[in-house]
């Protein structure tokens, strides 16, 4: 048996139970944060601007997905809320992407 084969066999036996637990925990936390952000958007549109739930969900989906389609005329307050909400959603998604990439890089590439 060559040196390479023995080394490969030993390396393949290494288990990483903590990696899977950490990744699962990270995904659960990020999913919960996403649910909170979407819920805050729906609540904001529903109660601040007296929209129906369908319109509130629609506006939240448009803002969250960064489509930016502006349905109808909006008041200044709606524009301000949508702008602030869009910035928060953007920061959230950038944070999520950087956290996942950083975690995967340090876990799988540096080890």
From Swiss-Prot:
Organism superkingdom: Viruses
Cited Pfam families: Ion_trans_2
TM ranges: 27-47, 80-100
Database matches in InterPro entries: K_chnl_dom (IPR013099)
Protein localization: Membrane
Annotated keywords: Membrane, Transmembrane, Transmembrane helix
Gene3D superfamilies: 1.10.287.70
Topology versus the membrane: Multi-pass membrane protein
Principal place of residence: membrane
Protein name per Swiss-Prot or TrEMBL: Uncharacterized protein R694
Organism: Acanthamoeba polyphaga mimivirus
Taxonomic lineage: Viruses, Varidnaviria, Bamfordvirae, Nucleocytoviricota, Megaviricetes
